[in-house]
Structure formats: C-alpha cells, structure tokens
C-alpha cells in the first residue's frame, strides 16, 4: 500500500499510482549528472540493473513506454519496412500510429485471439515475399501481458522461432512483463530471452511516476539511443527519475502478488453477479462485459461512492495496484450489493 496517500478506489489503471514516501526520498537523494553524456550515475545504474534483470546486454531509459516501443520498432525497421503486430495490441492501436507517422514503418496488423496470441499460420502468411512490389517484413512484435493475460511460454517460443526462421527480428511490448513473470513464476529473463528487444514500463504496476526502458543488444540499444535523440527523449539529469525506477525494481516486483490476489478477489465478487459478465483475473486486471446492465449507470453509481473504473474496447476494466488496499476491495463488494439490491 502506498504510504503517502489515503486509501482510495481508483481502479482505472495502474498508471494512477503515486510515489511512496520511500520512493520520494530516493528521488530527492539521487546522485545526478548529464545522462545524454552518459554521466548520470543513477540512470546508468538503473539501465545496468534492467539489462541484468532481463538478461540482456544493455538498456536505455526513456520518458515513456510508448517512446521505448517506438524507438525499438525504428531500431529494427527502416523507412518503408513492415512490422507484424496484433490488431488490438497497444503498440498498434494505442500509441498514436507513431511507427507509421514518425518512422515511416508500415504495420501489418493481424487479429489477436482473446488470450493475446496471433495465429502462427496467419503470421507466416503475412510475411511478404522477396518482391520489389512489397515492403520488407522485418519484425514481429508481441505484447505480454495482453489485457492482463500472460502469454503462454510455449506460444512465445513457437512465435519467436517462426520469426527467426524467416529472418525477422522480434520485439516484446513488455510494459507489464513483470506482472507476467510474477503470475507465471517465470524469471523475467526467461521471458525476455526469446526476443531481440523488450520494453519495460516503470510507471504502471511498478509504481514509479515516469519512465520506461528498452533492453536489447548493445548494438540495438546504440541505434535506439540515436533514435531517442531524434524523438526528443534525450534528457539530462534523469537520476531523480531513475532513482524511482531503481526503488521500484528493488521493492515493487514481488509485491505485485498482492495486486494479483486483490484482482482475484474482485473477480470473485463480480462472479456473484452473473449479469456483470466478469472475466478471470490472471494478473491485476478484471474485465466486465455486462449483459442487461447499463454500463454508464453502473459506472456513475460507483463513481458517486468514490470508486472509479475505466473502460477498454467496450468493456469495463478494473485494475488493481499499490494504491488499492483490502478496504477498497470491500467497498466494491458493498457497492455491488447495493447496486443490485442484494
């Protein structure tokens, strides 16, 4: 539980978390230098820590995971090249079309299954033949977790092997990869090992106020550093931000189990009201697909009781995080009973 704020019921996203007192102190005490010149010791330490944690050679600090993903895509693909991506993946649907707008990289979206996978035969069929009429397919990008669901390890292995057999690089949008690791019991490096690059967001479940990392080989990170400068992401005394990331990686990964447990309790509460159409909680998210329930009225009823939820792709999304405590979960239980008159 965040020790600087009162318990509240903001379930919109794990991005709403606020730094704890310990994290704020680490930020205030951070040793800083000019990160563009690689002279910020705290940022350098964070990058080394992230690379080691994910089993990669190098890492680069970014203002956001959106920019980290974009730099990763552009580091793998040149102008006019193509990357394969899920049709409902964040990197394609929710990041402003950056690869196309800023990188002149063409997306080839393919349908995601409900669990986030992309059919392997569809991937094979989407890879363009070596013909000058076609863009060159350079990259396969996957997302883990996907709507709160960890990708199956055997699928990751099969998809990345398929990509390599066709000469494609692989990138993982791992904004919540630590949630996937905690939920499956896998070491984060075992998940990252299948990919050429991985992005990691610090400002979601990890609880930092800002920041993300791109990890990969030294060569790829070197290209991404040049791209980061072009995108305006080269910042100076970033140690005050990196210190929050270090604090998060050291203290907030294992505690994600608490978020996952609370999400499971939410799912159990919602399951008592079948008309809410609650999905299962595999990590820190629960999705509702109400049947015969006015979603706006439902959300307004809860908001009037200081319980805020979000929506995503036609569903209500509930996300647990370090600012959600047991009392917040019980408030949801009481509000559900009141709403349905039970």
Model-identified regions with their sequence ranges:
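Conserved PLP-enzyme active-site core in the AAT-like
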Residues: 2-324, 332-342
């Amino acid at each position: 539980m965040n020790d600087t704020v009162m318990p509240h019921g903001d379930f919109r996203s794990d991005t709403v978390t606020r730094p704890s007192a310990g994290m704020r102190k680490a930020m205030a005490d951070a040793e800083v230098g000019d990160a563009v010149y690689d002279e910020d010791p705290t940022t350098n330490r964070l990058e080394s820590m992230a690379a080691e944690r994910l089993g990669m050679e190098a890492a680069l600090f970014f203002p956001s995971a959106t920019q980290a993903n974009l730099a990763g895509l552009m580091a793998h693909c040149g102008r006019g090249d193509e990357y394969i991506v899920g049709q409902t993946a964040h990197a394609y649907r929710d990041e402003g079309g950056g690869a196309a707008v800023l990188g002149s990289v063409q997306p080839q979206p393919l349908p995601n299954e409900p669990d986030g996978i992309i059919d392997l035969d569809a991937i094979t069929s989407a890879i363009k033949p070596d013909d000058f009429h076609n863009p060159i397919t350079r990259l396969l990008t996957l997302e883990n977790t996907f709507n709160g669901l960890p990708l199956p390890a055997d699928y990751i292995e099969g998809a990345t092997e398929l990509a390599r057999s066709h000469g494609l690089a692989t990138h993982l949008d791992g904004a919540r990869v630590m949630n996937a690791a905690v939920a499956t019991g896998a070491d984060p490096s075992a998940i990252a090992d299948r990919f050429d690059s991985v992005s990691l967001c610090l400002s979601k479940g990890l609880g930092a106020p800002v920041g993300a990392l791109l990890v990969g080989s030294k060569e790829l990170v070197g290209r991404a550093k040049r791209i980061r400068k072009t995108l305006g992401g080269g910042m100076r005394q970033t140690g005050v931000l990196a210190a929050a990331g270090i604090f998060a990686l050291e203290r907030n990964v294992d505690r994600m189990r608490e978020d996952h447990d609370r999400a499971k309790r939410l799912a159990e509460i919602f399951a008592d009201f079948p008309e809410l159409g609650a999905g299962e909680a595999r990590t820190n998210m629960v999705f509702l697909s109400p049947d015969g329930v006015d979603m706006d009225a439902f959300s307004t009823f809860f908001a009037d009781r200081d319980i805020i939820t979000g929506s995503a792709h036609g569903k209500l999304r509930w996300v647990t995080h370090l600012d959600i405590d047991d009392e917040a979960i019980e408030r949801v239980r009481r509000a559900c009973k009141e709403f349905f008159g039970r």
